[in-house]
Regions:
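Residue-level recognition of oxygen-bearing side chains
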Residues: 38, 106
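Intrinsic disorder/low-complexity detector
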Residues: 1-7, 11, 43, 47-81, ...
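A structural feature that tracks compact, well-ordered secondary-structure segments
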Residues: 8, 14-22, 27-33, 42-45, ...
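Short, tandemly repeated low-complexity microdomains enriched for cysteine and small residues
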Residues: 27-35, 55-61, 95-103, 123-129
């Protein structure tokens, strides 16, 4: 089974998207959008910029990159000690976040999977999900 985008709409009409792997693991999760059109637009943006470079200011991945221009992925260590990445759009706003991973290598594996699958994954919709 291949990766897919899921648009999840709540009963109030807000929605967000998730890019899920073939094993149904989250690869990217977008923020709340007020309309379905905005959510679809966010998926279109993620498809376009999925090959963006990785910014790692603190050198968690082995080599610090310094600050990069948008669009980009930003590698981060969460206050909980777990690692994640976020996808930033050309306008400088965060578009989506990756899963919280226990190790740097797990986060880099999730990033590689997101880059590989984001461009061509099909889209499905769910109503009433969380």
């Amino acid at each position: 089974m291949s990766a897919r985008y899921e648009i999840i709409r709540d009963f109030s009409g807000n929605c967000h998207f998730e890019l899920r792997s073939g094993a149904s693991l989250p690869l990217l999760t977008g923020g709340n959008r007020t309309t379905l059109a905005l959510c679809r637009g966010s998926i279109a943006s993620a498809r376009i910029i999925c090959d963006a470079p990785l910014e790692d200011i603190r050198g968690y991945t082995g080599a610090a990159t310094g600050v990069l221009k948008f669009p980009k992925y930003r590698f981060e260590r969460m206050p909980s000690g777990r690692y994640t990445f976020s996808l930033w759009a050309k306008n400088g706003k965060r578009l989506a976040v990756g899963p919280a991973c226990g190790t740097v290598s797990a986060a880099l594996d999730a990033l590689a999977a997101a880059r590989r699958e984001a461009r061509y994954a099909p889209v499905s919709e769910r109503i009433g999900g969380v």
